[in-house]
């Protein structure tokens, strides 16, 4: 690797280091081999998770609403008892996803491994980083559509129809805009209007969650913020999008994958030059002076190691 790329990656280490709960295994990027396509909504709409309470598991201080697991998510609801709750979710792929829910709050947790058998284990904070087991259960998930987990908001990609980021996406993109046009427009806007927040990157703490509207209003963020903002804007346009967390080389990083109808999942792909897709994640691009040099690095999928899909 050239000295210039090494220097850039060293800088990005300071900007993009995020502490993520350890996984029991490594995830793999997947493509849709079922022939299924994402649902079509006319007019376009932002999907809103619901927790009607018709089917629940657990007990106070933590209830899991599984009424809509066929839509690709469950909702964790924590009592206001002053303790943080931890939900660990795993499927047959061996990846353990860990979610923390503060006292009195709720969180939407997606089934990003698709249909299948999931093991959910729940814990309550006892003291500091010590947690005691609450309950565990096996869930059988059969999705109505395999793309739903990547269209709904969740704890990591948190948005509503009233989010400024969603309103912006709808204002930037015409109703009849193609997916390629939508992806390119959102990509260009975010990378041109958001810059690295070095102070935030230097002080980010364990359990950090992006606030997409804060990123938009301040025009600053770290790698996690870039990826979450773009993911939310694309999902609000009914474009399935994965927020990926892992490593670029040996640096903790976040990037996005998008689904193009009739083409499939495009991994680490954000822009389209009219002839081919260029693998380009938004944080490297926004902070790169030598575009050709950095594209030669980030365009190689071997440089990316996936840990989690959110």
PLM ranges: what are they?
Residues 2-180, 265-268, 301-310:
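N-terminal accessory/pre-domain segments preceding catalytic cores
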Residues 63-64, 199-204, 223-225:
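Short N-terminal helix-initiation segments at or just after the protein's N-terminus
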Residues 153-218, 266, 274-286, 293-310:
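Secondary-structure boundary elements
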Residues 182-186, 219-234:
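Active-site nucleophilic cysteine motif
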Residues 225-303, 307-310:
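Hydrophobic/aromatic-rich core segments of domains that either
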């Amino acid at each position: 690797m050239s000295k210039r790329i090494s220097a850039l990656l060293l800088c990005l280490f300071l900007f993009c280091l995020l502490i993520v709960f350890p996984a029991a295994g490594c995830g793999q990027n997947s493509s849709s081999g079922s022939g299924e396509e994402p649902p079509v909504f006319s007019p376009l709409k932002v999907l809103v998770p619901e927790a009607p309470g018709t089917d629940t598991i657990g007990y106070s201080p933590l209830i899991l609403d599984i009424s809509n697991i066929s839509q690709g998510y469950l909702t964790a609801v924590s009592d206001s008892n002053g303790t943080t709750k931890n939900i660990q979710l795993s499927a047959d792929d061996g990846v353990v996803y860990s979610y923390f829910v503060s006292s009195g709050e709720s969180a939407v947790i997606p089934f990003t491994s698709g249909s299948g058998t999931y093991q959910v284990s729940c814990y309550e904070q006892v003291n500091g980083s010590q947690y005691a087991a609450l309950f565990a259960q096996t869930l059988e998930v059969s999705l109505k559509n395999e793309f739903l987990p990547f269209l709904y908001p969740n704890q990591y990609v948190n948005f509503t129809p009233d989010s400024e980021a969603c309103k912006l996406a709808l204002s930037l993109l015409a109703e009849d805009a193609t997916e390629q046009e939508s992806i390119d427009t959102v990509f260009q806007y975010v990378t041109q209007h958001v810059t690295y927040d070095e102070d935030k990157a230097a002080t980010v703490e364990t359990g950090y969650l992006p606030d997409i509207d804060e990123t938009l209003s301040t025009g600053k963020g770290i790698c996690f913020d870039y990826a979450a903002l773009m993911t939310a804007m694309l999902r609000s346009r009914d474009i399935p999008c994965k927020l990926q967390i892992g490593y670029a080389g040996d640096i903790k990083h976040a990037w996005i994958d998008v689904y193009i109808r009739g083409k499939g999942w495009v991994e680490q792909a954000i822009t389209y030059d009219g002839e081919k897709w260029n693998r380009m994640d938004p944080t490297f691009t926004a902070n790169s002076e030598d575009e050709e040099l950095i594209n030669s690095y980030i365009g190689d999928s071997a440089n990316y190691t996936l840990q989690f899909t959110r």
